[in-house]
């Protein structure tokens, strides 16, 4: 089944929690050959090291988290830090939903900062995630289909006024020494036709 969560790049991270009082805490680390977000490389096609943590309440469905990665836009900034919070749950009929807010921050170049609110709904292996940009930030609509429990998935997105993208991903079903591995192929068609991209990404990740 598709479970909506904060998405910044193809991390393909499995879920593993440890209990801390009434909250669940998850730490994650990942190494990738590229950081691709909505079909566009955020590192100039160079490798990315990322990590973060989530604190969530299994009883109430609320969560809050921080995630960061290196970036390269050919400017002063080289770091992205994201802060997010939301509420996620699943109905008795198996319909899951996720509502939240995310702030994308670039400490060395604050003019790049932006914010979104998002709503995701999924049933079995099909889902849609709608992100509403704040203060003139473009909106984004993303459809995802997981092919059963095979680990194979397809995502199609429309980033309003920026471009459209497709991602085909495969998450290997077995971990090795607690490390997960995933691969993906992405295609981005820019709205003006001048910034099209094709990408391949592989990611090693681990949760604690």
Model-derived regions, located:
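Outer-membrane beta-barrel proteins
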Residues: 2-7, 17-208
């Amino acid at each position: 089944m598709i479970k909506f969560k904060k998405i910044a790049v193809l991390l393909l991270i499995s879920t593993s929690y440890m209990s801390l009082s009434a909250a669940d805490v998850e730490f994650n680390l990942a190494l990738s050959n590229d950081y691709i977000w909505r079909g566009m490389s955020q590192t100039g096609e160079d490798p990315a090291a990322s990590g973060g943590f989530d604190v969530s309440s299994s009883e109430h469905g609320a969560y809050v988290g921080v995630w960061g990665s290196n970036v390269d836009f050919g400017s002063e900034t080289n770091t992205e830090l994201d802060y997010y919070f939301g509420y996620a749950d699943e109905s008795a009929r198996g319909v899951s939903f996720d509502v939240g807010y995310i702030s994308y921050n670039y400490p060395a170049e604050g003019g790049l900062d932006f914010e979104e609110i998002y709503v995701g709904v999924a049933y079995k292996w099909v889902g849609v995630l709608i992100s509403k940009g704040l203060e003139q930030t473009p909106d984004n609509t993303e459809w995802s289909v997981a092919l059963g429990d095979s680990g194979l998935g397809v995502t199609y997105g429309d980033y309003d006024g920026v471009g459209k993208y497709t991602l085909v991903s495969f998450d290997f079903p077995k971990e090795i020494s607690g490390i997960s591995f995933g691969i993906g192929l992405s295609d981005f068609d820019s709205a003006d036709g001048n910034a099209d991209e094709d990408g391949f990404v592989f990611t090693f990740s681990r949760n604690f």
